[in-house]
Amino acid sequence: MEAKYLTYFKVENFKRFDSLEVSDIGQFNLVVGDNNVGKTSFLEALLFDEENLGNFLSNLNSVLANRKILGLNNDFTIVDLFAKDPKVSMKYFFQYLNYPEQSELKVSKRLRSSLQTEEIDTVSTKLKLYPDLQFIEFSLGTNKYYIFPGELKLITGYYPYIPFTTIYGNDIVDFFSRLAISSSWLENFKTNLREFIPNLITVELSNAITKESIIVLREQDKDLAQPLAQYGDGTIKLFRYLLELEFCENRRLMIDEIDTGIHYSRLKDFLKKVLQTARNKNVQIFATTHSKECLEYYKQALEDLGLQDSGRVIKIADTKSGIKSFTFNFAQFDNALFAGSEIR
């Protein structure tokens, strides 16, 4: 499967954005900007999936669940909860590397009572199955698709977004158990983890401590296996990122505050491991940071790996004419860092 890297993205009427346009996007994109300017909202906007619209809605519903916000029912739709103006459609414009044409996806809230006769014929089965008062209409090119909130109960899928609060959880137990079936994968995974745990022998699942299986690590000179949850945030984050990159192969992964919990002395090696794994798996990364140290180590990691052409810094700023984005290629943000210019 060919990797799909966004090179251009524009979203309209999404959360606080009337319109946010981002161009010259790279494979690796570090997103910076002031607090509450919309960095996290930008990551959430990137959860669109024009190839699987049900998964797209499920992704946004996962955002709500993660934030402990009311999910979808027959009185609410994604447009109500994510659109700046729920009466207006959300619009996505996007272009992929090696795909010359720009595409548009429109997401609109519709009332059940607004269906025309020909539309009723199209969704007659869904009307019988779901009592929802409202539904979502997707317009992609000349095609239209309809999804009712009740359908989301049947949709389960991987959610390619890592909130900054997410560290250890049952999901990575599931991720690991599915991947560790492969001995070659497990050996490579352990090699990557030894960047942070030099004495690591192996990683395995155990239910000796709790009824549910947990991830434990065995190290040299330690008789007992240690639960992953007892390790530091940096180790657990690397563990999670390496797993999630596997599930995002040939797609994109959004990471909020990628450097939080990572000691500065480990940050460059941490970023190198994440970037190299993403390169190997053809994953496009969008990650936020507030840290100037992270910018500097990101630059050094790209240099060490020879990936300067793939790196970008995207700044989101609240200007007099609204929220805008500014993309810096490697040479531009390298010069800005050298000159001491503030680009965060």
Model segments located where?
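Phosphate-coordinating catalytic segments in nucleotide- and nucleic-acid-processing enzymes
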Residues: 2-3, 8, 50-246, 252, ...
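Switch/communication elements of ASCE P-loop NTPase nucleotide-binding domains
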Residues: 1-52, 222-344
